[in-house]
């Protein structure tokens, strides 16, 4: 695979920092540009982040002294230096939409961690193991944007990446009704216990916009391409409750599901065990070898023990049981800033690179 020069837009935030650490020794991608808000522009990356470095590993040495660029004012300059950008900015939704489109129109593809373009009909929202074929919509999107190379591809919300992968191989039994209660880590809000002390010994029963995303995004991920847009699937019916819990990393979901054709417990376990996607077939650098891991123990998965499974890119599942109201219930866990954010973004970029979309 050839090498690609990349930029991180929004490099100073938590997801931007995670992108920086993941790309430090990436076999295909070299970080050439770091950009953020005007107040960071002109400073070194180290100066711009200051005491806000939230990763457990040190800031990549090769990036410390890189001079920050202005994500909005320097679009043309950035586009000239890189093959594509990762976008993880903290701005208003309509501003993000405008920004990402400006990069795409400057012939600089955008792999976005933001929610702004997730429901743009010709923007693929991809979990690489689940709907890799949605990247084919890029041809139609380029037509609309009037670009040769430029496009926007997004990853889905971190909350759905715990339970949608577990449900996906079971779709052949006809998913009917899904209830998911998510217990979401504070890093999902870009925070640590140091910056959000109110979360110690606390639980907040509301995360703005999260329930809507958690109920609607899976329907697009499972949708189909028709007439140059992605049309959402009508089923299953999904209802969610999303809670912020005092955990640093790792989103857990308690899932209840009913089927058109109820499978046996053994059939479900077999589906999870044997499921493999395009990233595994292509052996993409960030892909977990085994995407779905099932734990037999009653007290697993646990955020502390299992979130880093396969470099934080695998999904952990446990406690599969029959249910009196639904057919089955189970618990699943994913690392929200790895699989759920930057790691999922890097994996999506690897898929796009392998399929020639950056050439």
Language-model-detected regions and their locations in the chain:
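Charged docking surfaces used in two-component/phosphorelay signaling
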Residues: 187-359
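N-terminal Rossmann-like NAD(P) cofactor-binding subdomain of oxidoreductases
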Residues: 1-205, 237, 309, 315-316, ...
């Amino acid at each position: 695979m050839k090498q690609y020069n990349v930029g991180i837009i929004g490099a100073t935030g938590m997801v931007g920092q995670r992108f920086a650490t993941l790309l430090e020794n990436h076999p295909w991608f070299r970080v050439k540009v770091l950009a953020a808000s005007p107040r960071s522009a002109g400073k070194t990356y180290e100066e711009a982040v200051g005491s806000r470095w939230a990763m457990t590993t040190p800031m990549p040495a090769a990036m410390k002294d890189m001079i920050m660029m202005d994500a909005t004012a320097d679009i043309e300059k950035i586009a000239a230096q890189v093959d594509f950008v990762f976008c993880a900015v903290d701005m208003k939704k309509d501003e993000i939409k405008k920004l990402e489109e400006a990069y795409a129109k400057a012939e600089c593809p955008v792999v976005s961690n933001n929610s702004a373009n997730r429901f743009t009909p010709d923007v693929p929202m991809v979990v690489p193991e689940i709907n890799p074929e949605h990247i084919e919509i890029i041809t139609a999107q380029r037509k609309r944007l009037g670009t040769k190379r430029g496009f926007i591809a997004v990853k889905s919300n971190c909350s759905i990446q715990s339970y949608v992968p577990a449900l996906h191989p079971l779709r052949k039994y006809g998913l009917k009704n899904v209830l998911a209660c998510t217990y979401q880590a504070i890093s999902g809000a870009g925070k640590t216990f140091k910056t959000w002390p109110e979360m110690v010994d606390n639980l907040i029963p509301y995360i703005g916009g999260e329930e809507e995303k958690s109920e609607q995004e899976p329907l697009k991920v499972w949708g189909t391409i028709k007439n140059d847009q992605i049309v959402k699937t009508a089923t299953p019916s999904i209802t969610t409750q999303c809670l912020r819990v005092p955990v640093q990393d790792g989103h857990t979901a308690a899932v209840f599901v009913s089927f058109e054709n109820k499978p046996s417990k053994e059939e479900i376990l077999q589906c999870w065990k044997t499921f493999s996607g395009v990233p595994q077939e292509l052996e993409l650098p960030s892909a977990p070898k085994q995407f779905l891991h099932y734990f037999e123990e009653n007290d697993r998965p646990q955020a502390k023990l299992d979130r880093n499974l396969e470099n934080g890119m695998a999904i952990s599942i446990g406690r599969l049981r029959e249910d009196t109201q639904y057919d089955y219930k189970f618990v699943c866990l994913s690392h929200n800033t790895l699989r759920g954010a930057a790691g999922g973004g890097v994996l999506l970029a690897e898929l796009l690179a392998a399929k020639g979309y950056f050439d």
